[in-house]
Amino acid sequence: MLLAVIAYGGFQWAHQLKEGLIVAGMNQPVYWGLYLTNYVFFIGISHAGTLISAILRLTDAEWRRPITRAAEAITVFALLMGTSNVLWHLGRPELIYIPMLHPQPLSPLIWDVACISVYLMGSITYLYLPLIPDLALLRDRSPRLRWLYRWLSLGWQGTPKQHKLLDRAIGFMAVAIIPIAVSVHTVVSWVFAMTLVPMWHSAIFGPYFVVGAIFSGIAALLIAMAILRKAFHLEPFFRPIHFNNLGLLMLTMACLWLYFTFAEHMTVWYGNEPDEVAVLTSRLSGAFSTPFWTMITCCFVIPLCILSFKRTRTIIGTVIASCAVLIGMWLERFIIVISSASYPRSEFMHDGGLYSPALVEIALTAAQFACFALLYIVFAKLFPLVSIWEVKEGDQTELEAELTGTAEAQL
């Protein structure tokens, strides 16, 4: 099924390359709708892995150990899907190397490319380093793919010196990846904020986008954990405490997200600048009111009602809230992109009009989600989704703490 969706998306992209960008609606006043929406959305959920995992590592949260790898894998595959949207809206993707050879430093797009490239390489490294001990374990126990695991394990023998070097490398990457991750979505927001388009030209977009990215990333991680828990029988590792703690973190981010959303719209309303008020009105009570209030319901009302109470902050409850958040955050990206572009700021510009996605955009959107799921499934088949050596290390630490506590009590 996933391969069929991906194949159809590839067929539609080939059709776009043959017929030109006109089949993607690029001759309409409002365009790049789904491509740009999906770009921002996937870059956002990529924060599920490296950023959340790095913060939990640095704070030495013991409950993080079983979930870090599942989170870090989301980052890598989400980044691949996000950057693919750059190819979709190029009429000549084979010439993409030209801007790399002749970059324009004043263009926010070049900084986008630079930040995302560094983030992708850093995320792959951050995913790979903790995999090495488990790859060595697979090398010794899996005859079918031993050649692959032998090559990837880099001669790991588990000596104290190797463990010390690995811990130092992981610690360095955990510190380095946090500012990189924050810079990525900040620079993504500047693609909008550096323009004079109504309700894009805003100084609040940087932190607003970062908060939204972490928010949607946590939701994506919770859904992935629930599916993996059921599909691969990982109940002993993905326990209710993990869903409870991540649910509380998601509730905190929901409140932060509402604060930034309110601050953005309040300043526009109070400023009473005609072009921006036209966009604001379209969101609150006009053409975009339905997706806007659906977004508010999905991103705040539903998580607040479910995650505020321990009785409903269960595995099922957190998954329902996470699904609502992902829907709401996709709608938020859609509203940001489309509502502002639908209202011209000058009489010399187009006469506006509502955006309507083309078939090729819908097909490529479905193909991206299918490809993301397929890559994640393949990764789960080839590599352990739970860091075996880290879980064992955590169990050993817990046992030593219990023995120390017992000895002190006897004294």
Features from the language model and the residues they span:
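TerminUS-proximal long segments
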Residues: 299-303, 313-411
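N-terminal signal-anchor module of multipass membrane proteins
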Residues: 1-48, 373, 377, 390, ...
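Transmembrane alpha-helix boundary signature
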Residues: 14-15, 86-98, 128, 132
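Interfacial and helix-entry/exit segments of alpha-helical transmembrane bundles
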Residues: 70-76, 235-258, 317-328, 394-396, ...
